[in-house]
Curated annotation (Swiss-Prot):
Record's subunit section: Component of the ER membrane protein complex (EMC), which is composed of EMC1, EMC2, EMC3, EMC4, EMC5 and EMC6.
Protein name per UniProt: ER membrane protein complex subunit 3
Recorded name of the encoding gene: EMC3
Chain segments annotated as transmembrane: 10-30, 126-146, 176-196
Organism: Saccharomyces cerevisiae (strain ATCC 204508 / S288c) (Baker's yeast)
Pfam families membership: EMC3_TMCO1
Length: 253
């Protein structure tokens, strides 16, 4: 079967360009409606807590790339810092409860902002996708756009040939509405290429923007710090830099 060359200019390219431009426009809209609240979702003390826990995890996982002296210095600093809870947020909540207690999520402003941003993100994702799906179904229904260059099993026929009623058609042929779904699920690398982050786009989850790193619950942060300090204390350090000069000379001489 041969396809008209004009299909890629009048069907394939318009759908692809509209999908990319819609994603870019949605990013700017989400920045306008959730930009200020998203940046205030995590207070600085919470970010500091999370960053020190992440630092300890990275040291445990990648300590073999450091020399013994460097690892020992970082280990001593982190163990002392985590044990003494220097960066633990101990401020009281607005309702008077201690930070170590489990907070009421309905009284947490950051939780309310996160839920509102999620609702805005869902709307900003659902409405454009619904409009574009109607546009593709109305103007490009029944078109076969391309043939994939690799073989597929018959189970992909229903996914790739939506709107095409032809049992004998090879499974590799792709319809217009199927190309729309493929674009929705596979445009994240394109957004990364043009400078839009996956988390900022929120294509799959429908969220409005970055909410900051999510660490352990407030009631468990102190326990997590002590557990991480204990792990750092008992870890056996094996560096890949021991006798590296002799190993390099032995390999190349």
């Amino acid at each position: 079967m041969l396809l008209d060359d004009q299909l890629k200019y009048w069907v394939l390219l318009p759908i692809s360009i509209v999908m990319v431009l819609t994603g870019v426009l949605k990013q700017y809209i989400m920045t306008l409606i959730t930009g200020s609240s998203a940046n205030e979702a995590q207070p600085r003390v919470k970010l500091t807590e999370w960053q020190y826990l992440q630092w300890a995890q990275l040291l445990i996982g990648n300590g073999g790339n450091l020399s013994s002296d460097a690892f020992a210095a970082k280990k001593e600093f982190l163990v002392k810092d985590l044990t003494e809870e220097r960066h633990l947020a101990k401020a009281k909540q607005q309702d008077g409860s201690q930070a170590g207690e489990v907070p009421n999520p309905f009284n947490d402003p950051s939780m309310s902002n996160a839920m509102m941003n999620m609702a805005k993100g869902n709307m900003a994702s659902f409405i454009p996708q619904t409009i574009i799906m109607w546009w593709v179904n109305h103007f490009f229904a029944g078109f076969i756009l391309m043939q994939l260059p690799f073989p597929l099993t018959a189970k992909f026929k229903e996914m790739l040939q939506t709107g095409i009623i032809c049992q004998d058609l090879d499974v590799r042929w792709v319809s217009s509405i199927s190309w729309y779904f493929i674009s929705v699920l596979g445009l994240n690398p394109v957004y990364n290429l043009i400078g839009l982050n996956d988390q900022d786009m929120g294509i799959q989850a429908g969220i409005g923007g970055p909410q900051g790193p999510q660490g352990p619950p407030q009631s468990q942060v102190d326990k997590a710090m002590h557990a991480m300090a204990n792990d750092l204390t008992i870890i056996q350090h094996e560096t890949c830099l021991d006798n590296v000069e002799q190993r390099v000379l032995k390999q190349y001489m």
